[in-house]
Amino acid sequence: MNPKYEALFTPFKIGEVEIPNRIVQCSMGGTTLFGWLEPSHFDLEGADFLLQRAKDGVGLVLPGMQVIRDTMGRKWLDSNRQMYRVLKPYMDEYHKTGSKLFIQLAGGFGRSMAVTPWMAALGRNDLLNKLASPIVDVQYACASASATPNRWADNLTSRPFTVEEIQEMVWHFGATAKKLREAGVDGVEIHAVHEGYNLDQFAIANMNFRTDQYGGSLENRLRFATEIVQEIHEQAGDDFPVSLRYSVRSCTKGWRKGAMPYEEFEEFGRDMAESEKAVKILQDAGYAFLNCDNGTY
């Protein structure tokens, strides 16, 4: 082996969990364990694909992200016991490879939720949205830190999450992590204070105009993310490792205006100076690992 590659095959730790090497498969669409729009569904094809990657020697596998409450605002991910009963024997087989597996749990999309014209029409009409909510709750699916324009639909504005909705979601992050640990999963990754997704919308001052405990100071804007890791440790144990998907810099010039590499611009989102403060807050809250990138799509 070329000596410059030797470090790839050395172990490292995330919290107390040792990863056998430094080859990591990050989350990608189409690689989920619990499906996407199918509530309470264990994806056998996705599971087989991930198991093969572990057999091929990948040290850590992160399946595609799982929204903590299904995309249309109906079922919570922790609500179906059968799904976790199927997961347990799968994890027993998976661990025979020596690889570790973290599940990426998502706090939703907020203003980044892709909507069709008919969904935007529902979201703009309180009565129609209420009538349709047992099937699709567009207003909940697009809810964000504050009233902000949808990324894809000019004529739809996200409503702010209530404090009660935030705290309900925080609790379900903990409940889901507990069930995942009981099923043999090695850790979780929280999606995400990155790329303009929902938790990132809370974290960025120009997207968060709240005056309660989830807005204002950097500590308050990160409170949603820090309460999640604290609740996970409360329910799943302090030694259960939690990673965070994180964008070091937002690289945005304004609403729907991205910056190109090496371009000179005034940062609309999170800059490096703020990021250096943010990572300390997140680490002190209990995150064991930051899975970092740059930019916002």
Model-derived features with residue positions:
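Flavin-dependent oxidoreductase catalytic cores
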Residues: 1-297
